[in-house]
Amino acid sequence: MRLRLLALFCLAFAACLPARAEDTEPIKVGVLKFGTVNWVMDTIQTNGFDKAEGIELDVVPLASTQGTTVGLQAGSLDIVVTDWLLVSRERTSGAAFTMVPFSTALGAIMVPPDSPIKTLADLKGKTLGVAGGPLDKSWLLIVAYALRTANIDLRTETTQEFGAPPLLAARAKQGKIDAVLNYWPYAARLEAVGFTQLIGLEDVVRELGAKGEVAMLGYAFNAAWAEQNPSAIDGFVRAAEKANELLATSDAEWERLKPVMSANDPNFDEATFDALRRRFREGIPERRLTFEEADAKVLFQFLRELGGTKLVGPGTELAPGTFWHGTTQ
């Protein structure tokens, strides 16, 4: 009897112990070298959230978004961050990509201090920097919004300068362009040096029919991989949620992240730090997945109308399964 009780005690005690390294499931996560997802991955690893969930992250830094997509397609990466538009397009073409929300933080049109530009109509005849290219989703949503609310076609009534986000941010600070539509980390950096927001994408998507803050970006992965490794994907999602909870509440954790945030940014200062932290926190997803999916379906139609098949692929609606509802779907 004593031996049996001792054996039961040992089994119960072992179940309470954290997973050993050899028991963890490895997950390769592809990230842009200086992207904001690094902050979440660093938080997960430093605080042991991955090990506590029985997984071990292998973070793979990459130079371009194309590299993350290629890695996922080739199976050399398990998870990458991308937008639901790409996931939907890939699914329409036969791939089994799917995703869970990463961030609702969106870009904005920023104007310099003391700029005479106060409304979208004031952009007429001006030079507008646009991060990405003519088919960038943020740009096309802004175009749709301007047509609806200000009766201005930004494609024909402004001069666009397309380019990389850091280059356009620098040109805006140098006064070489009148305004810039940039991704949120660069918009936050401009805010830190006195630029103001003319219009944010959060307001744009609401005007176009979204019911809340939309997570355009998500953690994308292959559904077949998730079905074969349910504990791995579930553990990753829980670890990411724990990281977000910590980043939403702990200023000390952000202080620890400063070296990661300031990498490759010679102008990083306290104002930049505060702006990035605030905008990241505002972008932590909080809505139910069904709401995210419903809003994505609405926005998809605007993007299809303005970007055509070059942007959205051959599909006429958001591909079913774009958002991951778990292994029981």
Predicted regions and their residues:
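Pocket-lining segment of extracytoplasmic ligand-binding domains
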Residues: 84-85, 166-261
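Conserved C-terminal helix/tail region of periplasmic/extracytoplasmic solute-binding proteins
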Residues: 297-329
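Sec/Tat signal peptide C-region and signal peptidase I cleavage site
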Residues: 17-21
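Bacterial N-terminal signal peptides that target proteins for export
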Residues: 1-7
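Short, solvent-exposed loop/beta-turn-alpha elements that line the ligand-binding surface or hinge
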Residues: 52, 202-212, 282-293
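Secondary-structure end/capping motifs
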Residues: 226-307
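Short, glycine-/small- and polar/acidic-enriched structural segments
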Residues: 22-155, 159-162, 174, 178-184, ...
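Bacterial N-terminal signal peptides
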Residues: 7-15
